[in-house]
Amino acid sequence: VLPLVYKILRSNTEIKQAVGEAIYRHGIAPLDAPRPYITWFLVSGRPEQQLSGTPCADFDLVQIDVWSEDDAEVERLARLVRDTCEAEGLAVRIAVNGYEPETKLFRLGLEVDFIRSR
């Protein structure tokens, strides 16, 4: 089962106002995507191991990237993403922070740990 990234991010009205429907899976946005936008992808997923029986939970590592033409806006949106995920009890850390010369967009990427009971 895929993590509930879209649902969690859309629960924050400020994120919703900033990006609208522009939250894209697989880490890829359309070339004509409105800016700013958010992409996300599953880095890895594994069951939580235990000594006996089937796993009781799944651990998914997801990267969520915020993209914008404005550096300050990227930081503001990344803070909103971080705060929204942390409010759901998810661990968040910065994975990448930079500028993409090909797209002329700033990018701030967050790694988020989704641990879900089965």
Region annotations inferred by a language model:
Residues E48-Q50, Q63-W67, E88-A91, R118:
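Glycine-rich loops and low-complexity Gly/Arg-rich segments
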